[in-house]
Amino acid sequence: ELPVAFDALTVVINPQNTWARTLTVAELKKMWEPGAQGRITNWKQIRASFPNEKLMLFGPGADSGTFDYFTEAVNGKAKSTRGDYTASEDDNTLVQGVENNKGALGYFGYAYYAAHKDKMAAVAVDAGKGPVGPSLENVTNASYSPLSRPLFVYVRDTSAQRPEVKEFVQFILSRGDLVSEVGYLPLPKTAYALTLKHFQDGKLGSVFGGVPKIGITIDQLLAMEAKL
């Protein structure tokens, strides 16, 4: 289990939407929970001060890890969500849906928001301590919760001794600077050094088993990985 980056799941709206630049986790749940299906269809139902505007939702399909993490973080259970939204595994389809509909709201990884900032606005999410937007700083200081998540590379123990696998792992853990180039958020250098040492020492096991803990911080991640 090799932690390589953090991602900030980003809730986005159409640029013409001037009323929902901040939303609480409870309001997101009100939109996305299973009981909202066929019932919550207007922005005014989310907050009384919002306009009478049709709510249109866009998000990844059920086979996506982003879907699993978002539904657990917001609704309390992975894969628990309303079904009457526009789902796609192609993030470009989601971008276009939000871009072309004033009342749209969607979510995906930070990379797609960063690549299309001119077409949409990011929502600052309030988990109880005030609204916080997605950024490297806010993921690093643990204030962007619960929508920040660690990303991992998993290596089979029987493959770890192959020269090309060793070379690949050495490369990805020594070039954390490349992480930001593809829209993800790099870990501290100490994290990459610790992970590389674990790999070189042949430490096996997984803290998360492929399912990261909701709301975990970088410091918590490092502490847990250090115990492997």
Show the residue positions of the predicted features:
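Flexible loop/hinge segments at secondary-structure junctions
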Residues: 1-228
